Regions:
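Extracellular/luminal re-entrant pore-loop and selectivity-filter region at the outer mouth
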Residues: 9-279
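Short, small-residue-biased leader/transition segments that mark boundaries at the very start
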Residues: 1-8
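Non-transmembrane, juxtamembrane loop and terminal tail segments
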Residues: 280-289
Length: 289
């Protein structure tokens, strides 16, 4: 199929990495957004991974497992390390800026997390400053991380158990197991999965502008932006806060770009712009003379 051809030909890549010097880890650079191939490839890749006959059975469980695994093994671990560094260096004048930055980041991340898990509260944001941070603040943040960790451990275990139940239904005997293996082999593309899950990414989590960003499993990660902008391989996108499947969003964008290009060509917009620039250039030259 097309996904095998694309993956084997090394044509798959992250449009968010077009120029790492001027892009950020959260979204695709604007100049990447105007490439029709970006919208077309992402639509096909996401749909082929998420909606193939095998993956669509397990996708929601794997999404919950992926999100939980990232939070408890990368996100919380990174924040705990920063919290411990803050406690260690809080009175070190040479590291005052680093401590302030870490406290700012911890506060940002807790605020973001509270929009996802509303029932786990943290009410001491005013203590997350170099001037007010103390042992009480340290314990309160630690307690918050403990509760969030417990939440994601439970979420992971529930999703994993449900997935295992489903697999058991399809593998009741040796014959069924063989058929299940063949079924997966027919529909699940390992190379495409590596791209959509960003499995080869060395940095699983990165820090940028006072926040932490997930770099693995983009296919299981929903974007925060309320209007269209998203990381590459996002399974769905938000339009005015409403989630819509990536396939339909991207197809709509391709149609809009096509219609825009048609109008541009039909009314010779590009020619008129070039003619205008040429006239302006001639006027400037004449004024100099």
């Amino acid at each position: 199929d097309w996904s095998s051809d694309v993956c084997s030909s090394d044509l798959s890549f992250g449009f968010d990495k077009l120029n790492p010097e001027i892009s950020n880890p959260k979204e695709i650079p604007v100049y990447g957004e105007v490439m029709t191939s970006r919208w077309a490839y992402e639509a096909l890749a996401v749909t082929q991974f998420k909606n193939n006959e095998y993956e669509k059975i397990f996708y929601l469980y794997e999404k919950a497992m992926s999100q939980s695994d990232f939070k408890k093994n990368y996100w919380i671990r990174t924040l705990r390390n920063k919290l411990n560094a803050v406690e260690r260096d809080i009175n070190n004048k040479d590291k005052r800026k680093k401590v302030a930055d870490d406290l700012f980041l911890i506060g940002n991340e807790i605020k973001k997390e509270m929009t996802h898990i509303k029932r786990i509260k943290f009410n001491s944001f005013e203590k997350l400053t170099v001037q007010k941070f103390d042992s009480t603040a340290f314990n309160e943040v630690t307690n918050y991380f403990d509760l969030v960790n417990e939440y994601y451990v439970r979420k992971y275990n529930i999703a994993s158990a449900e997935k295992d139940k489903l697999i058991s239904k399809y593998t009741t005997n040796d014959s069924a197991k063989k058929l299940f293996v063949l079924f997966k082999k027919q529909y699940y593309n390992d190379n495409l999965a590596d791209f959509c899950r960003n499995s080869n990414e060395v940095e699983r989590i990165v820090e940028y502008n006072g926040q932490l960003y997930q770099k693995i499993d983009p296919i299981f990660q929903d974007p925060d932006n309320k209007f269209l902008r998203a990381h590459f391989y996002s399974p769905r996108k938000q339009i005015f806060g409403v989630f819509i499947d990536t396939f339909w969003v991207n197809i709509s964008i391709i149609w809009i770009m096509t219609i825009f290009l048609y109008i541009t060509l039909y009314f010779k917009v590009l020619k008129r712009i070039l003619d205008f620039l040429e006239r302006m250039s001639e006027k400037l030259m004449n004024n100099k003379d």
